[in-house]
């Protein structure tokens, strides 16, 4: 039974899987967006968010922990200097996964995992207009419609008489 065994194995050995995710996290922070399969993106999200949380802490121990996982020292510097301050006010949810479809060769579902960049601003409620300006604006349109209706010639009313079948008319003419 597979109880209490979290995470995906992805068909790799433990050392291969750890090395792959270290490379992917380094690439994600270097480029801020990478394309991969859905399963890898979902696993990578948790690792990347833990690294950003370390970056938000910002102390020496956090720097050393991140440096032990991320392969490039320039990327560690970027994480602590530019990426982590971007999310100071945000509690989690630093990454976004966008599904792309399937890969043509092996039909693997592909996704883009990227760092969320937008800044959330408080929305200002729009107040309803209280001035009767809308009613004044519609009056000329109503008057134009009335004038146009008065200018059109009225069709005379025609009485509809009994409709005769064309076949009967032909027979009547033939007699």
Swiss-Prot record:
UniProt record, GO biological process: translation
Stretches the record annotates as Disordered: 124-175
MF (Gene Ontology): structural constituent of ribosome
Biased composition (Basic and acidic residues): 161-175
PANTHER family attached to this UniProt entry: LARGE RIBOSOMAL SUBUNIT PROTEIN BL17M, RIBOSOMAL PROTEIN L17
Family: Belongs to the bacterial ribosomal protein bL17 family.
Name this protein carries in UniProt: Large ribosomal subunit protein bL17
Species assigned in the record: Geobacter sulfurreducens (strain ATCC 51573 / DSM 12127 / PCA)
Encoding gene per record: rplQ
